[in-house]
């Protein structure tokens, strides 16, 4: 790799990191790939390809994973309904939220909310977060869900 191509690769990685940081910060806001790409002055197609190559998933998939992780935390608290959690994490469709949640976690959000309260009772929040962290896309076990 030549010096100029290595420098370009570092610039591209820094750009992708800015996109990922923005998703982490603004997950609850309406975000789409086009807006993220405009923010770093590249095309949406280029951003999607480069992001997938660097992080192993598309920007949209990464965004939804962050939203579902936050939703899991809110559902474990138990003081919000599934609909309130859906909108609190930036999803505008309860159906899409429930489908994606089920894909990542292996059970519907309403079931998770009920079981999480029972399964994490008495466990410190920092440990519960690690134990109940979602798996990546479409890797949820097909069998019975287990929270611990």
Where is each model-derived feature located?
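Alpha-helical bundle regulatory/interaction domains
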Residues: 1-46, 53-54, 58, 70-148
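Short, basic-rich loop-to-helix N-cap that marks the start of a DNA-contacting helix
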Residues: 61-63
């Amino acid at each position: 790799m030549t010096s100029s191509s290595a420098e370009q690769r570092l610039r591209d990685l820094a750009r992708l990191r800015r996109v990922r940081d923005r998703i982490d910060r603004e997950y609850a806001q309406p975000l789409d790939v086009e807006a993220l790409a405009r923010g770093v002055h590249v095309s949406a197609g280029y951003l999607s390809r480069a992001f997938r190559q660097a992080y192993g998933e598309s920007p949209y998939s990464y965004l939804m994973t962050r939203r579902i992780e936050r939703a899991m935390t809110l559902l474990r608290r138990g003081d919000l309904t599934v609909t309130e959690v859906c909108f609190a994490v930036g999803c505008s469709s309860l159906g899409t939220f429930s489908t994606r949640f089920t894909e990542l976690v292996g059970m519907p959000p309403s079931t998770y909310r009920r079981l999480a309260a029972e399964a994490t009772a008495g466990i410190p929040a920092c440990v519960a977060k690690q134990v109940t962290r979602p798996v990546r896309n479409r890797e949820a076990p097909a069998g019975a869900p287990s929270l611990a």
